[in-house]
Amino acid sequence: MKKNQSIEGNSTLVLASESSARQSILTGLKLVFDVIAPDFSETAQPGVPPAEIALINAKGKAGSVAAKLAGQSEANVIVIGSDQVCCTDSGMVLHKPGSRDRAIDQLTQASDQWLTFYSSLVLIRNGMVERAHVESCAVKLRRLTNLEIKTYVTADNPLWSAGSFHAEGAGLRLIEKIETTDINALYGLPALVLLQALRELNDPLAYAAWS
């Protein structure tokens, strides 16, 4: 957890996620933030568009943390919720695999295919939703051999990543092409939209020490 040291009058930022990738993005932006795990079970309702699933989950995560914080502090709190859903061109959602065999199956299906990642962002301040956004990223995987897939899954263990690979790490070795306006959205958090939203909220931001 990052200890929030924002100047009096600034907002306290709270990330409603234990995702190391999202924490790394915020840390790289020199934002000071706290981390609180959400009490929310991600939904995957049949028939619901993937972009909507991502938004529902982000709202649920941020909302659960905002409810925890309600009445606990006089600070101006902004809760950041985010989720990511991956689907194939045919519309099949590739959920977090949860097992090695399922990850191998997903990557086998996705080999030489275009995938779309929907990364959502929800900001809740003092109980009110201030921003709700979904960013899409297109990724083309190389034609992968069975050996490449099994070796990658064993080495990188992407069992809790949508699409069964870590694009911010060794998963890049599986990729042929990326189309996105914000690479951070592919990594799990639409950072450009987040920063724009914070500016629009007239928040001066609390920067971590530059040293």
Question: Can you name each region flagged by the protein language model?
Answer:
Residues 2-13, 47-211:
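Anionic-ligand binding patches
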Residues 21, 41-43, 129:
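Surface-exposed, flexible loop/turn segments at secondary-structure boundaries
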Residues 2-31:
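N-terminal beta1-alpha1 ligand-phosphate binding loop
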Residues 18, 38, 126:
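Cofactor-binding loop segments of dinucleotide-utilizing enzymes, especially the Rossmann-like FAD-
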Residues 31-32, 166:
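A generic short alpha-helical patch detector that favors 3-5-residue windows
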Residues 34-42:
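A short beta-strand-loop structural module common to alpha/beta enzyme folds
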Residues 24-28, 45-46, 72:
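Short loop/helix-cap segments at secondary-structure boundaries that form the rim of catalytic
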